[in-house]
Amino acid sequence: MAKIGVENSLTDVQQALQQQGHEVVTINSEHDAQGCDCCVVTGQDSNMMGIADTSIKGSVINAHGLTTDEICQQVESRI
């Protein structure tokens, strides 16, 4: 399965993606996101960690306003 980076505060999303069989990595900085197929960020500070630019090869999903299920669906559609 895919390697998904999830921002530290999104523990419910981390658990849901792990249950789906994904490798989940907690991202606290831009460096943590490297090598991830996709990253999920809170969007509270949309570019706080520099992840919104091209620092990773995968998609960046802004979790702001989305449910855990909606986030998981977006992850599945982008990997």
Swiss-Prot record:
Tell me which Pfam families the record gives.
UPF0180 (PF03698)
Family matches, as InterPro entries: UPF0180
| The family this protein is said to belong to | Belongs to the UPF0180 family.
Q: What is this protein called?
A: UPF0180 protein BCE_1513
Q: What is the lineage of its organism?
A: Bacteria, Bacillati, Bacillota, Bacilli, Bacillales
